Amino acid sequence: MGLYALTAIGAGAALGAWLRWWFGMTLNPLFPTLPLGTLAANLTGGYLIGAAIEYFHHNSFLPPEARLFAITGFLGGLTTFSTFSAETVTLLLRGQYAWTFVIIFSHLTGSLVMTILGIMTVKWLAQH
């Protein structure tokens, strides 16, 4: 991977992360029970990755660094949920409903389980 690609990913990721932080700082205090900033980041990312995939599909003349900046960098920094959404919708559009269910179940359940395991690991390490 070249320097331009790395720079594109890094710059996009920084901007995406800053936007996610801004969503959290601005929206999370409005309704503390449901982190609206995270929801806004995930919904925005899902929408934008769909738009980006379609845009880059029809504008293949753009340099690969543009896609890396937008999708891998910016949307990856904003949320990885956008990638999950794009992959799931792709399976749905292909009519692969069983795999769609498996992917949804794996991502959601896996993320929750890993979060719990992470919490438990840190708690265990703090006690030993």
UniProtKB/Swiss-Prot annotation:
GO terms for biological process: cellular detoxification of fluoride. It catalyses: fluoride(in) = fluoride(out). Na(+) is not transported, but it plays an essential structural role and its presence is essential for fluoride channel function. Na(+) binds at G76, T79. It is a multi-pass membrane protein. It comes from the Bacteria. GO terms for molecular function: fluoride channel activity; metal ion binding. It holds the Pfam family CRCB. PANTHER family: FLUORIDE EXPORT PROTEIN 1-RELATED. NCBIfam families: crcB (TIGR00494), PRK14196.1 (NF010792). Belongs to the fluoride channel Fluc/FEX (TC 1.A.43) family. Fluoride-specific ion channel. Important for reducing fluoride concentration in the cell, thus reducing its toxicity. HAMAP family: FluC. This is Fluoride-specific ion channel FluC. It comes from Nitrosospira multiformis (strain ATCC 25196 / NCIMB 11849 / C 71). The lineage of its organism: Bacteria, Pseudomonadati, Pseudomonadota, Betaproteobacteria, Nitrosomonadales.
